Each structure stands twice: as C-alpha cells, then as structure tokens.
Design a protein with these regions (language model features):
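Conserved catalytic cores of ATP-dependent inositol ring kinases
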Residues: 1-300, 320-330
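N-terminal export/ancillary region detector
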Residues: 301, 305-317, 321-322
Length: 330
C-alpha cells in the first residue's frame, strides 16, 4: 500500500548473470534501502575517520570538518544533498533538496562492525518535513557484531517517533539448513558471512495477517550454488500467480560430470604443420675504396690520401607457430 506524501519504501529485485551470491542466491539481488560503506579499492580500512566512504556506490570526498562533524560531498555531484557524519554517536544524516532526511544510525543490528570499527552503516530511518517516517529494522542473527546484516522489517506511514501501521517483513530460512554456497567477506578486517536465504516477503497492517506475500523457491545448482527458480505472489484471498526462472546448465557427459572444455578442433591447411610457419632471410654487403695524390710549392701543401671502407650484414627471422583467431570469437 502507498504511504503518505510518497513516503513508502522502494523494493526491487534485479538479476545479472555476472552478479554475486547473496540472500537471494546467485545472480539475483534485492534493493530495499540505502547504505554508506567504507571504500576498500585501494586498501583495507584504517578506522581513523580518514577513510574514504561511498554512498550507494557513489564515492564521497571530505568537504569540511569540525570537532564533532565531518561534511562530505559526492565526487560527482548530482543530487546536491547535504551529507554529514556525526562523530559523537557515529551516525550519518543525508538531507536532500526537499528537506527529507535519511538517517544511518550506529546500531549493532544495522551496521557491519561497531563503534570505532564500523565498516557499513545501513539506512535506519527516513523522515520528511511533515515528520512522516519510514523505519528500517535489521538483524545480523549473530552474536558477533561483524555478522552479515539482514533486513527484517520496514515500517511506514509513521509519524515522528511512532512506527507506522503498515509494514513489510523479510523472512528467512529458519529450518536450520546450512547453505553450501555461503559468502565470506573480509574487507572490514573481520569475517562477514552471508549464510541465510530470503524465503518470502510479506506486507501487513498493524502486524496482522499478511495482505500480500511473495514466496521465493530455490534449487541447488551444479556448483552447489542456490538459484531462484520461482516467485509466487499471493494475497489474503488465497489468489496467487507464479513467475518461473530457467537456467542453462553446463554440458555433462554420460556419467553426469561437467564438461569444462570442448574437444580440441584442428584447423589444417594441407601443410606439414597445421599452423603456418614463415621463414625469411636477408643478406647485404657494401664496399668502397678511395685514393688521391696532391702536389704543391713552398706555399702550397701537397699530400697523398687514401682509404678503404666496407660493411656487410646478414639476418634471419622465422616464426615456428602463428596462432590466429580464425573464427573471430576472441
């Protein structure tokens, strides 16, 4: 359901064949909020407030700082938002041109790491100028504060500090099944392990029965990776429809073993060697000679000169194998 003044969460599911492995298996990803994370392209974090940060993948640069705050701006400005990090309680606030504020609170459940060694801050609250709110809740399901952060609920249509009546809840496999394709990330200098699968998303009013439910079904691929095979949408009237997803599995032999490489194909042009062999030889010589006789009086010098010079050169080049991309497939 829609929120007030457009204040409702935006949730989207996307797929990329080059995508990684997360809470929706390999290739699929879900966007539901926002995050500020430490940039590790050029090294691990130092956790000294001088690290470089990224807002939803956009690189930030420091603009100014005081004893209690640091102001940042995107290196490529587009949204013209005010981005401030508050050092006292280690949280961020991003305010856009309309006055809507996004808050990234320091919290053991919503952050990767904690305190001085916080690596990622996830969005915890959105509030507009009319005090309408969207509140995000998380759970790392781990005693260690560096565990993977899973979204668990989003409440909207709230006002000020009060949670909204409408909510979206994220449900995970709770039957103790251990994923064979767990993802381990150590960029924060600690092991962050993603080992749960998102099994359904439900929408509620006043935390009652689901208004609508989105159920995700997975299968295990040949490499033990989890692959999303269906998405079923149902409502409280038991009406539903399903989207299915198919994958092209690698070719296997008669024993079920994956064929990683095809048989070798030879391109033969009727020569002794299937690949062309080239040879070339060059020889060069150069000789010259010169002589001279001169005569003079007392005032005129006379001399005899002579000289001989010569040069020669010889070279040979050859190519034993000439590998050519014949069919142009790289």
């Amino acid at each position: 359901p829609a929120g007030r003044k457009g204040m409702q969460p935006q949730i989207a599911i996307s797929y990329s064949s080059a995508g990684g492995n997360g809470i929706m298996g390999k290739g699929f990803d879900i966007s539901y909020g926002s995050c500020i994370t430490t940039d590790t392209r050029f090294g691990l974090p130092k956790y000294d407030t001088n690290d470089t940060y990224m807002l939803d993948g956009i690189l930030l640069s420091e603009k100014s700082r005081t004893e209690t705050t640091i102001t940042y701006q995107p290196k490529r400005e587009a949204a013209f938002s005010r981005i401030i990090r508050f050092l006292d309680d280690n949280h961020w606030e991003v305010t856009d041109k309309s006055g809507t504020k996004r808050i990234y609170k320091q919290d053991e459940k919503s952050c990767v790491g904690y305190g001085q060694e916080t690596f990622t801050w996830n969005l915890t609250k959105i509030v507009d100028v009319h005090k309408n709110t969207v509140i995000y809740e998380y759970n790392d399901f781990e005693e260690d504060a560096a565990g993977y952060v899973y979204p668990t609920a989003i409440y909207y249509t709230g006002y000020d500090e009060t949670k909204g009546n409408y909510s979206i809840k994220f449900n995970y496999d709770e039957n103790g099944i251990r994923r064979q394709d767990v993802r381990v990330d150590a960029r924060s200098k600690k092991f962050v392990v993603c080992k749960k699968l998102l099994t359904s998303i439900t929408t509620h009013y006043n935390d009652g029965d689901p208004i609508r439910k989105y159920t995700f079904t997975y299968k295990e691929g040949l490499a033990k990776e989890n692959l999303l095979v269906s998405l079923t949408v149902s409502n409280n009237a038991d009406e539903s429809y399903t989207y299915t997803f198919d994958y092209n599995d690698p070719e296997t032999d008669s024993n079920g073993n994956v064929i990683y490489f095809a048989d070798t194909q030879e391109w033969y042009m009727g020569k002794d060697n299937p690949l062309q062999i080239t040879n070339s030889t060059s020889i060069g010589k150069n000789n010259n000679a010169s002589a001279g006789v001169g005569y003079g009086t007392k005032c005129i010098d006379g001399r005899i000169t002579g000289g001989v010079s010569g040069s020669s050169g010889e070279g040979e080049t050859y190519s034993e194998d000439s590998i050519v991309d014949i069919n142009g497939d790289g």
